[in-house]
Amino acid sequence: MDRIHITGGAPLHGEIPISGAKNAALPLMIASLLTGETVELANVPRLADIASLLRILGNHGVDHMVVGKRPGQTAETGQTIRLTASNVIDTTAPYELVSTMRASFWVIAPLLARFGEARVSMPGGCAIGTRPVDLLLMAMERLGATIEIDGGYVVARTRNGLRGAEIVFPKVTVGGTHVALMAASLAQGTTVIDNAAREPEVVDLAECLSKMGARIEGAGTPRIVVEGVSRLGGARHEVLPDRIETGTYAMAVAMTGGDVILRDTRADLLHSALDVLATTGTEVTALPNGIRVRRNGAGVAAVDVTTDPFPGFPTDLQAQFMALMTKARGQSRIRETIFENRFMHVQELARLGARIRLEGDLAVVDGVERLRGAPVMATDLRASVSLVIAGLAAEGETIINRVYHLDRGFEALEAKLSRCGAQIRRERV
């Protein structure tokens, strides 16, 4: 199992290219099941989760071809993938594949909408709370599906196709909104999705579905209206930049000091996080094709944050921000409102010398003058990268174990950081 070694203390200087968003690419790839024509996706990151989903889609009979990368991308970043679901042979998604990644459960929507049935194993993936699929199944039932649980599998069927309906989510759910959008695109009649997720990744999916022939209005607002169509066609779409990767590297610069341009990204994708970062004393400047992040002199100031659905502070940046606050001047209070059990990184940050106290969904962080390198263990995707950020600023060597979590969500992380001066290397074991 690979390990990452970091010798901290070096400020970051240079440019970091931002990859396409994994959280956008996954539903876009799944949406290829809605049509027998080819869907071409550009700027798809090279990640373990992408490879896992390609295996899952291949199990259904989807053909895929990697056709290249866009100009300016390095050998280890970015790819264009063509997906063709013209010969779907199986509407069952087995446990051994779905258990590797929760998002793969979303195949239930296009399989049900296009073929009238789907048998999908209950999901696996990150161990950060229960993440129940109840809201996703509720959306399917509202559209006329019958749902049964049989031996750990969700079996969804519809006799005469899905029918438009009003779907009111009791709480904001990104996965539920993705599933509802895909299913409603091929449902008969009008579907109204209320309390819809407003995340940029939802908008990206809606834009791709529209290119395929779907009729969608209101994506990016709490109310989305979908007029179902009888069939969808192929399309070409470029995956939007990864706002979580953008915020992660921005916080790394704030942690170490330095001056870095984050290229091929957009400030409007994460205004809340960038505003918080600016409040810490970090200089953040929007550029035509990216964001400049600079911090010189004194360390950052402590700032309180609460995670919220978009456009609020992203839960997927909570662990990274906590790492930054471990060396801040003063006390920071970080409240997690999206997922329970998302403070698993606290114990590992404490091994580096962080002072953090947990009170239910609240983490109270008292900044310390210095962190010291130590062996630590990655527990999930976002927690693992928070340890990287802390290690970049710790005295001595930090060794991060179980870094396969990083490979699920961060493309070429060591290469991007080392080009900016970080002393970071991977040990293959």
UniProtKB/Swiss-Prot annotation:
Q: Which GO terms describe its biological process?
A: cell division; cell wall organization; peptidoglycan biosynthetic process; regulation of cell shape; UDP-N-acetylgalactosamine biosynthetic process
Which residues make up the binding site for UDP-N-acetyl-alpha-D-glucosamine? Answer: R102, R131, P132, V133, D134, L135, D316, I338
Q: Name one GO molecular function term.
A: UDP-N-acetylglucosamine 1-carboxyvinyltransferase activity
Report which superkingdom the organism of origin falls in: Bacteria
CDD domains found in the cross-reference section: UdpNAET
- Keyword annotations of the record: Cell cycle, Cell division, Cell shape, Cell wall biogenesis/degradation, Cytoplasm, Peptidoglycan synthesis, Pyruvate, Transferase
Which residues are modified to 2-(S-cysteinyl)pyruvic acid O-phosphothioketal?
Answer: C126
In which residues is phosphoenolpyruvate bound? K22, N23
The main location is cytoplasm
Active-site residues, Swiss-Prot/TrEMBL? C126
Question: In its keyword annotation, does this UniProt entry include Lipid biosynthesis?
Answer: no
Under the cellular component aspect of Gene Ontology, which terms does the record hold?
cytoplasm
- EC top class named in words: transferase
Q: Where in the cell is it found?
A: Cytoplasm
Pathway-wise, it operates in: Cell wall biogenesis; peptidoglycan biosynthesis
Keyword Transcription included in the entry's annotation: no
UniProt family annotation? Belongs to the EPSP synthase family. MurA subfamily.
Q: So what does this one do? A: Cell wall formation. Adds enolpyruvyl to UDP-N-acetylglucosamine.
> How is this protein named in the record?
UDP-N-acetylglucosamine 1-carboxyvinyltransferase
Gene from which the chain derives? murA
